[in-house]
């Protein structure tokens, strides 16, 4: 019998064997103790593997969720909450009780939880890799390459110089030097999946800073993987073994990219064609490939998550593969198993065993590498002419760490690369630095500030200054197109008053990590979202062809989390100098007028756009699907349009838009002006500064009505909100479209009693009434964005049209006084 076998026998006789996972000693136990017989038969469920694992998972998930709720106001992420949950449940806090440890974390109960959580983790890492578009490395740009390189090179190089200095100055033991070198490699890295996760949680993934941080992180991670792979391979005993291991791992990556990737793509395309349904994926074959690659990784001496991650990277992100696999696997891997895996790092953390010998030196090196990373990123950003606030925010984002770094810490601790002291310090510092960085980024960076710093563009300004009318139309699906085309037709594009239209297809980000905002022609032709975008674009292009020379359209697609996609809307509106953003209402109506579907995410988008938009915003309540489908094919438009006017900036904006509709020779426009009885009294005093522009606008509409028989002005005298409601209810189905302002003077007697309740405050008091199922016409609720615009201030004075029943060819907003030329209204189409 060999010496090794003899030691094993002696160990078993002492009641212990070498553990199969962490190379530690374990107490021998019966291997059939899996499920309990039940407490009624005298069995203790927590002595069995299955009940104990279920208890551990339940407690970990519940604790991490509670901590996340508590820390959410401080902008902390789920990963931080999960690590804290492990620390609280582990030996650092609750684990000080030996009875608790024997019940909740016995030695025999660790392996089952760790094995299952590792399974979930490598599936999660596969999903993270799946969301990565490897092509963005080529698209990163010189700025991102410079910043990403500086973010990795400075902490890595200065950190190692610090190690040489400490080694020679303090005569550090070799194991401590080796541990510190490992710390430097870890802290120098910035993981692309972690960065995009942080950006998404902070709702800045599709902001300018978010896109730059995304590109910088993938450049930094490319360096990290190269160094980590070489470091991992050449730690082996024996040079030849290290070389062979490196060769075989490289061969595995080549097999993944040049064998597995083409095979999976071929299977996906073949299945989609055979069942004639886009989006279907060969789920079972992909899972078998994933398990095989993960097993091969373990055989070659690297973690199963390594092969899983690179398999994910090799596959196309987004639909159908990215979206389909994410939908099927994310709940199990991310929501159920990942909290257990992350919490295990906290369970292994013990504050009470941190010694005093080299703690200060190790912590100093950790902080130095973080500081070098921050300074390197900030300096490179300043060199690239990035504003100082954004440069600091970017540097803080590059210092954030998460699941990849935690996995690396746990793996190196298990392999004895990191000692317990170093592991504890890394986890604690990671929590503190990431938590502080996230909070400071929220304080320093506000993507909407670039919108607020600009002067606002309004419809009133466009009319007064004779500017081109520029519309940004947001659509989610093909069903939104017909009524949007109706709205364009009603807006009456003409040779002397053309319209520039920018359509934006909004797609919720699924199956990919980075947000995109691109012109339609740059979309991936194999992406199912491109197919839907093409159908949307075709509808608008058909209308554009019917109005050549009077309407020019550009088409864009934005894929981003719905929590922050409002930044794409506002960015495009700012870049294209849009006058009005039109966004669909979050409720969809059936043919009979009842609410068919409600999407709370769309409502949040609308609220964010209303708050941050650089121009006027219109929320469109679409009830004209049947008629709308005819608009694309038959140039059908609404025949009867009403505008509700009470008072205020938004009502004036709605009236200005309706006056453009009134130019259409085939559309009848009725202005319904609500006035209180007191306003008719001769001694009624008005605020001249606030109502002067309204008076000019109303008089202008009245004069326009005198020259066009299809334009009418109707005055309704009411005493309170009850009579206002009665008048509105009497509208019935007389109109195809009603245009109304969002905000009014809430103290107005016209609205008395109506302001106490509102289901949808984003529509205002009157708009909220129109959203009920009692009405069957479409509604456009317009909000004039507050800001430094000409509209509704003292400088805005639309010239009063001459008192004439006059020439119908003369456009009411053109006059000799303003230096404009009269145009022929009936021959300019």
From Swiss-Prot:
GO biological process, one term: proton transmembrane transport
Keyword ATP-binding included in the entry's annotation: no
Annotated localization: Membrane
Keywords recorded for this protein, A-Z: Antiport, Ion transport, Membrane, Phosphoprotein, Potassium, Potassium transport, Transmembrane, Transmembrane helix, Transport
One MF term in the entry's GO annotations: antiporter activity
GO cellular component: membrane
Tissue: Preferentially expressed in pollen but also detected in vegetative tissues like leaf trichomes and root vascular tissues.
In-chain residues carrying the UniProt-annotated modification Phosphoserine: 827
Residue intervals passing through the bilayer: 48-68, 77-97, 117-137, 145-165, 180-200, 215-235, 240-260, 281-301, 329-349, 361-383, 392-412, 425-445
Keyword Disulfide bond set for record: no
Membrane topology per record: Multi-pass membrane protein
Stored InterPro entries: Cation/H_exchanger_TM (IPR006153), CPA2_transporter (IPR050794), Na+/solute_symporter_sf (IPR038770)
Function description: May operate as a cation/H(+) antiporter.
Family that this chain belongs to: Belongs to the monovalent cation:proton antiporter 2 (CPA2) transporter (TC 2.A.37) family. CHX (TC 2.A.37.4) subfamily.
Protein name per UniProt: Cation/H(+) antiporter 14
Name of the gene: CHX14
């Amino acid at each position: 019998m060999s010496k090794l076998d003899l030691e094993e026998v002696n160990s078993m006789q002492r009641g212990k064997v070498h553990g199969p996972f962490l190379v530690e000693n374990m107490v021998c136990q019966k291997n059939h103790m899996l499920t309990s017989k039940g407490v009624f038969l005298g069995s203790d469920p927590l002595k069995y593997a299955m009940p104990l694992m279920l208890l551990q998972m339940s407690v970990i998930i519940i604790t991490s969720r509670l901590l996340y709720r508590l820390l959410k106001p401080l902008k902390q992420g789920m990963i931080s909450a999960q690590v804290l949950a492990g620390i609280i449940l582990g030996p650092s806090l609750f684990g000080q009780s030996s009875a608790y440890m024997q019940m909740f974390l016995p030695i025999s109960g660790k392996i089952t939880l760790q094995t299952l959580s590792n399974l979930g983790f490598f599936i999660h890492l596969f999903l993270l890799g799946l969301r990565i578009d490897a092509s963005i490395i080529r698209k990163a740009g010189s700025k991102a390459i410079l910043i990403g390189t500086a973010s990795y090179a400075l902490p890595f190089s200065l950190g190692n110089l610090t190690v040489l200095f400490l080694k020679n100055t303090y005569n550090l033991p070799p194991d401590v030097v080796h541990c510190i070198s490992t710390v430097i490699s870890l802290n120098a890295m910035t993981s692309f999946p972690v960065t995009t996760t942080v950006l998404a949680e902070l709702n800045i993934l599709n902001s300018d800073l978010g896109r730059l941080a995304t590109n910088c992180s993938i450049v930094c991670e490319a360096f990290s993987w190269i160094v980590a792979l070489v470091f991992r391979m050449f730690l082996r005993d024996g040079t030849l073994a290290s070389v062979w291991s490196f060769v075989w791992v490289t061969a595995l990556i080549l097999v993944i990219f040049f064998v597995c990737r083409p095979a999976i793509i071929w299977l996906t395309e073949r299945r989609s064609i055979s069942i004639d349904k886009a989006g279907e994926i060969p789920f079972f074959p992909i899972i078998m490939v994933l398990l095989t690659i993960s097993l091969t990784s373990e055989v070659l001496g690297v973690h199963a998550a390594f092969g899983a991650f690179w398999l994910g990277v090799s596959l196309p992100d987004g639909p159908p593969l990215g979206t389909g696999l994410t939908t099927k696997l994310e709940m199990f891997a991310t929501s159920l198993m990942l909290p257990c895996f992350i919490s295990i790092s906290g369970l292994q953390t013990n504050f009470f065993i941190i010694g005093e010998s080299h703690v200060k030196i190790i912590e100093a090196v950790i902080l130095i590498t973080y500081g070098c990373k921050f300074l390197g990123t900030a300096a490179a950003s300043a060199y690239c002419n990035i504003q100082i606030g954004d440069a600091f925010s970017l540097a803080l984002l590059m210092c954030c760490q998460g699941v990849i770094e935690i996995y690396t810490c746990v793996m190196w601790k298990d392999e004895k690369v990191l000692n317990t002291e170093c592991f504890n310090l890394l986890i604690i510092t990671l929590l503190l630095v990431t938590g502080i960085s996230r909070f400071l980024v929220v304080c320093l960076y506000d993507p909407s500030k670039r919108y607020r710093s600009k002067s606002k563009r309004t419809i009133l300004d466009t009319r007064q200054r004779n500017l081109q009318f520029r519309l940004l139309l947001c659509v989610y699906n093909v069903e939104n197109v017909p009524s949007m085309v109706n709205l364009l037709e009603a807006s009456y594009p003409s040779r002397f008053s053309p319209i520039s239209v920018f359509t934006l297809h909004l797609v919720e980000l699924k199956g990919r990590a980075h947000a995109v905002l691109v012109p339609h022609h740059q979309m991936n032709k194999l992406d199912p979202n491109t197919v839907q975008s093409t159908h949307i674009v075709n509808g608008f292009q058909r209308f554009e062809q019917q109005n050549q020379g009077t309407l020019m359209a550009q088409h864009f697609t934005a894929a981003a989390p719905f929590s922050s996609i409002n930044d794409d809307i506002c960015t495009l509106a700012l870049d294209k100098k849009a006058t009005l953003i039109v966004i669909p209402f979050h409720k969809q109506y059936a043919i009979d007028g009842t609410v068919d579907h409600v999407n709370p995410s769309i409502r949040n988008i609308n609220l964010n756009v209303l708050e941050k938009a650089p121009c006027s915003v219109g929320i469109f309540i679409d009830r004209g699907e049947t008629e709308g489908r005819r608009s694309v094919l038959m140039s059908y438009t609404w025949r009867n349009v009403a505008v509700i006017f009470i008072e205020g900036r938004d009502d004036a904006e709605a009236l200005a838009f309706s006056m453009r509709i009134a130019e259409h020779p085939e559309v009848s426009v009725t202005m319904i002006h609500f006035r209180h009885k007191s306003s008719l009294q001769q001694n009624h005093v008005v605020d001249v500064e606030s109502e002067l522009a309204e008076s000019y606008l109303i008089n202008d509409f009245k004069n326009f009505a005198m020259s066009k028989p299809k334009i009418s002005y109707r005055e309704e005298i009411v005493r309170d909100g009850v009579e206002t409601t009665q008048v509105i209810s009497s509208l019935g189905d007389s109109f195809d479209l009603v245009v109304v302002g969002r905000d009014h003077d809430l103290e107005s007697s016209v609205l008395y009693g109506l302001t106490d309740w509102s289901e949808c405050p984003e529509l205002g008091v009157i708009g909220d009434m129109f959203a009920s199922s009692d009405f069957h016409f479409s509604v456009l609720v317009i909000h004039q964005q507050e800001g430094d615009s000409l509209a509704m201030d003292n400088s805005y004075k639309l010239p009063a049209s001459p008192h004439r029943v006059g020439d119908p060819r003369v456009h009411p907003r053109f006059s000799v006084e303003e230096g404009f030329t009269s145009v022929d209204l009936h021959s300019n189409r």
